[in-house]
């Protein structure tokens, strides 16, 4: 332990002992002499911390200058702490008391804290930001890692970091919403559950000789510099393990993805002769990437949209026959490919639809078997030559339909279908009608036809389409469905019908609307799950109201002309936020309240402001909250990011920690406040120590003035209050009693 650390520890012990001694020896008040000793300890500790920080900054600046000039930076780097140990942000531990200190975060924290050094004030130092402290290690559902200057991150980005400018850049691809990964130069932290990806390392080539590159020591990893380039700090500088810098074949050219869990995005594989490892740029919720064949016949993935599963196409070089996968939309079902005499489907992960495979060389069985399917599977079937039955596997959620039939059974029956079923039908020999089972949610429709019925019905069923149309010879009406992905219904029109109803349906659209010539109202259909929102308005009704929204809804709003109020409906899961504003704001009143609705899961944050008290308070936030702040921060739950709080006595300063005070003689001074607690295990002595400076009433410059407000419990159970204003603080060596005296 260094002398400075030992001295700091001794001061802290003496300080706490002084507080306990003050508390136990007095009946009602703490003597001024004891509190003056506290002020002396505070002043001495701050001076010691400032001296230590200046020494560390000087070493760091010297090291960077040495590296830039080409001098023995490799040896000097071993003796410098690039990222100093974290300060104990407890009582009297932070010399920069005007800085914001993040609260200690619980499980699933996003990051910790960072602190700037005094080098930021050096004009000629262009890399001042590189002396920042790294963020703490991140756990599951982490947002990002660390870098010396953190990028501005967008929605749900994972991480990224870069360092320096010019030739010293280390940059990660700009990440968008729900993007998967990207990094270079430094390894990513090990991520927990629901991880997006892992980490990989890059090398400079197949062989790495000790004579060509130079390894600059840097912690547990090393910086591999190219001594032949004339500029060691290049953009392509790589981090490698010290033990891998021999003349043998290195392993740093391997890239490995961590084993991914549920809702994983993709994986990759590598071919021997190409040596390429690449993952396609993936969009929102895409499933996997690509693969490459050895015979130059490349298999590429189609550009996939949201929630698409996969797709591919292949060229047969001999026959020129192309096999392409249909263009898949949202929640598309499957795709297939064929190579040679085999028909195989890729093994799909979660959100898989289905698949099947068949082997030509399997003559005896000629079986078609379905892969074991997971959630979001659609259906499947299998059949063998010796088995004249066709059976459907027991299907789970998101099943479409299925049927089975045996030779000795003249009936076709449909399995009981669950949610997201499309339709089904059954028919018996003695029954000339075809009837449709009662269908559940997201069911499409069915049809039936009898011998005496000259009408024809046709289902043009697509992926997850909802219904079709039918037309009879004597019926001059035509009904057509323009069906899209997850569309619910369409429209129809007849010659004698002057009403027209049209649905402009989009992806994940749930409903539409209709309007007739004589009807001046526009109404919205009742919306179900996966609905987005809707609205309706009547000519005589000046209000616009929003329907009650269900799951996966985004938001809605309504507006009242008389009050000019905007209110947000109570939102459910995956809601973003909402706000409302009082109509007095438009009339010039000073109410101007802004309140945030109570938010549920996946909420971002919220705040409200009350004009009379000028207070800003944060709503109680639930899981997946990002952050919030106020002068007294609420207790935050899991997945919170950070927060900070400031003494409630701060009513005058412009920024946290800087305050203005008036002493007993009328002098106005400004300074910095630092809270403390002491005493026994009950912690019943607490208060604020302020270091003040400024110009007094006579115009004289004043510095290092200490003011102390202390509250404590007396021996008889009462509360004692003490206020001391000290103009000149003596040395701690003169005032602090020894351990024997106490």
Curated annotation (Swiss-Prot):
Alphabetical UniProt keywords: Hormone, Neuropeptide, Secreted, Signal
Where found, per UniProt? Secreted
Keyword Lyase assigned to the entry: answer is no
Instruction: Look up the signal peptide feature and give its range.
Output: 1-22
Asked if Iron-sulfur is a keyword of the record, the answer is no
Which biological process annotations from GO are given for this protein? Answer: neuropeptide signaling pathway
Q: Name one GO cellular component term.
A: extracellular region
Which residues get removed as pro-piece? 23-98, 117-131, 164-168, 202-220, 236-253, 271-275, 293-297, 315-321, 339-341, 359-366, 384-388, 406-410, 428-432, 450-454, 472-476, 494-498, 516-520, 538-542, 560-564, 582-592, 610-614, 647-742
MF (Gene Ontology): hormone activity
**Tissue spec. comment:** Expressed in pleural, pedal, abdominal, buccal and cerebral ganglia.
Q: What function does the entry list?
A: Initiates organized rhythmic motor output of feeding circuit.
Q: What is the name of the protein in this document? A: Feeding circuit activating peptides
């Amino acid at each position: 332990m260094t002398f400075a650390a030992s001295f700091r520890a001794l001061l802290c012990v003496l300080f706490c002992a002084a507080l306990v001694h003050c508390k136990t020896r007095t009946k009602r008040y703490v003597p001024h002499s004891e509190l003056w000793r506290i002020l002396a300890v505070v002043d001495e500790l701050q001076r010691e911390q400032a001296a230590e920080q200046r020494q560390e900054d000087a070493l760091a600046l010297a090291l960077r200058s040495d590296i830039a000039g080409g001098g023995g930076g490799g040896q000097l780097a071993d003796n410098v702490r690039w990222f100093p140990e974290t300060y104990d942000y407890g009582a009297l531990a932070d010399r920069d008391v005007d800085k914001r200190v993040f609260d200690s975060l619980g499980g699933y924290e996003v990051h910790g804290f960072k602190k700037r050094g005094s080098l930021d004030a050096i004009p000629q130092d262009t890399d001042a930001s590189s002396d920042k402290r790294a963020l703490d290690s991140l756990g599951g559902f982490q947002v990002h890692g660390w870098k010396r200057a953190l990028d501005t991150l967008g929605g749900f980005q994972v991480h990224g970091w870069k360092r320096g400018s010019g030739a010293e850049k280390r940059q990660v691809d700009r990440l968008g919403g729900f993007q998967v990964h990207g990094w270079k130069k430094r390894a990513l932290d090990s991520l927990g559950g629901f991880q997006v990806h892992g980490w990989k390392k890059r090398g400079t080539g197949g062989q790495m000789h000790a004579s060509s590159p130079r390894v600059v020591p840097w912690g547990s990893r090393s910086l591999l510099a190219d001594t032949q380039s004339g500029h060691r700090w290049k953009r392509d500088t790589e981090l490698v393990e010290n033990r891998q810098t021999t003349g043998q074949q290195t392993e740093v050219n391997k890239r490995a993805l961590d084993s991914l869990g549920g809702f994983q995005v993709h994986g990759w594989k590598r071919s021997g002769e190409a040596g390429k490892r690449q993952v396609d740029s993936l969009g929102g919720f895409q499933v996997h990437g690509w693969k490459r064949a050895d015979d130059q016949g490349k298999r590429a993935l189609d550009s996939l949209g949201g929630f698409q599963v996969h797709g591919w196409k292949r060229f047969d070089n001999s026959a020129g026959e192309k096999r392409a996968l249909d263009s898949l939309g949202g929640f598309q079902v499957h795709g297939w490919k064929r190579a040679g005499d085999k028909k195989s489907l890729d093994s799909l992960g979660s959100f898989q639809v289905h698949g099947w495979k068949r082997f030509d060389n399997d003559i005896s069985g000629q079986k078609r078997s379905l892969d074991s399917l997971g959630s979001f599977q659609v259906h499947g079937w299998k059949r063998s030559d010796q088995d004249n039955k066709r059976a459907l596997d027991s299907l789970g959620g998101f099943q479409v339909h299925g049927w089975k039939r045996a030779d000795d059974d003249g009936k076709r029956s449909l399995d009981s279908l669950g949610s997201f079923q499309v339709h089904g039908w059954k028919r018996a020999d003695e029954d000339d009608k075809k009837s449709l089972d009662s269908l559940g949610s997201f069911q499409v429709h069915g049809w039936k036809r009898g011998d005496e019925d000259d009408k024809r019905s046709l289902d043009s069923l697509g992926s997850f389409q909802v219904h079709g149309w039918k037309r009879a010879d004597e019926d001059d009406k035509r009904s057509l469905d323009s069906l899209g992905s997850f569309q619910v219904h369409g429209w129809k029109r007849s010659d004698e019908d002057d009403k027209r109803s049209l649905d402009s349906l989009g992806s994940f659209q749930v409903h539409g609307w209709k309007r007739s010539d004589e009807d001046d109202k526009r109404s919205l259909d009742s919306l179900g799950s996966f609905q987005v929102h809707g609205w309706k308005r009547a000519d005589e009704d000046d209000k616009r109201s929003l329907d009650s929204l269900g799951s996966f809804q985004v938001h809605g709003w309504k507006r009242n002309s008389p009050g000019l109020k905007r209110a947000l409906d109570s939102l459910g899961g995956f809601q973003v936020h909402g706000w409302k504003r009082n109509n007095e704001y438009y009339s010039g009143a000073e109410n101007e309240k802004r309140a945030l609705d109570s938010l549920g899961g996946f909420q971002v944050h919220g705040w409200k402001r009350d004009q009379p008290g000028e207070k800003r308070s944060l709503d109680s936030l639930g899981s997946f909250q990002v952050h919030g702040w106020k002068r007294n921060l609420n207790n935050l739950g899991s997945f919170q990011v950070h927060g900070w709080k400031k003494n409630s006595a701060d009513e005058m300063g412009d920024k946290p920690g800087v305050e203005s005070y008036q002493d007993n003689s009328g002098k106005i001074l400004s300074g910095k406040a630092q809270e403390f607690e002491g005493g026994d295990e009950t912690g019943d002595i607490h208060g604020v120590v302020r270091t003040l400076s400024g110009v007094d009433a006579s115009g004289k410059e004043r510095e290092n003035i200490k003011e102390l407000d202390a509250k404590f419990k007396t021996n008889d159970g009462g509360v004692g209050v003490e206020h001391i204003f000290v103009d000149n603080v003596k040395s701690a060596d003169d005032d602090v009693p020894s351990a024997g005296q106490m």
